[in-house]
């Protein structure tokens, strides 16, 4: 419909308010969609326009890996009470211990190198330069954590989620080894690759054995 406000066609007060409301709603909706993921997934689509995209690569790596680790820890904590197989609970305890330790180290480095230890929340985690959506498909979101609380059989759902989650962490860690500047962070990336590949191999074996 075409409406002229300053022409021969005059709008009544009520239609004018409706038009203005629609315009304001569209503007605010577009802004919120680019600035926050809300209840959706990781904010991949605007990585190129994000102010953090011009940050040093090590900072971007920390800002990706910390919330990525938090997702793994959150899911592993659920496994402590829901897992059927005791070996999966043992793995979950290991994930919680190792990744919480790595989160602490990365936050300390971020504060020392970039003035703050604050990293994005899990649902606003962004891709690293050089990563594509396939690499980040395993990124954990709050909705995934919620679904895991009722998944059945839990152990299969856990393995099917944690394997690609580890794979995406390895992809990011390899980029850190290639493009990072701080040797201690590159060394941590090597640890992530080695430890999580070992866990992937174990989880894949369990998946085949328990759910052929």
Question: What residues fall within each predicted segment?
Answer:
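Bacterial N-terminal signal peptides that target proteins for export
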Residues: 3-16
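C-terminal motif of bacterial Sec signal peptides marking the signal peptidase cleavage site
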Residues: 23-26
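All-alpha RGS (Regulator of G-protein Signaling) helical domain and cognate RGS-like helical scaffolds
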Residues: 29-212
């Amino acid at each position: 419909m075409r409406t002229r406000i300053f022409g021969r066609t005059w709008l009544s007060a009520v239609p004018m308010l409706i038009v203005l409301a629609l315009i304001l709603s569209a503007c605010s909706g577009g802004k919120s969609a680019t600035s926050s993921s809300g209840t959706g997934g990781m904010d991949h689509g605007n990585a190129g326009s994000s102010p953090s995209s011009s940050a040093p690569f090590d900072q971007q790596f920390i800002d990706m890996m910390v919330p990525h680790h938090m997702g793994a820890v959150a899911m592993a904590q659920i496994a402590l009470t829901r897992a059927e197989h005791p070996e999966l609970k043992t793995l979950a305890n290991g994930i919680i211990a190792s990744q919480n330790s790595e989160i602490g180290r990365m936050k300390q480095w971020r504060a020392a190198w970039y003035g703050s230890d604050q990293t994005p929340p899990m649902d606003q985690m962004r891709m690293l330069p050089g990563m594509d959506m396939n690499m980040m498909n395993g990124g954990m979101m709050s909705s995934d954590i919620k679904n895991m609380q009722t998944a059945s059989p839990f152990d299969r759902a856990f393995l099917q989620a944690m394997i690609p989650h580890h794979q995406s962490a390895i992809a990011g860690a390899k980029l850190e080894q290639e493009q990072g500047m701080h040797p201690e962070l590159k060394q941590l990336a090597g640890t992530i690759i080695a430890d999580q590949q070992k866990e992937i191999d174990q989880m894949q074996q369990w998946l085949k054995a328990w759910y052929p």
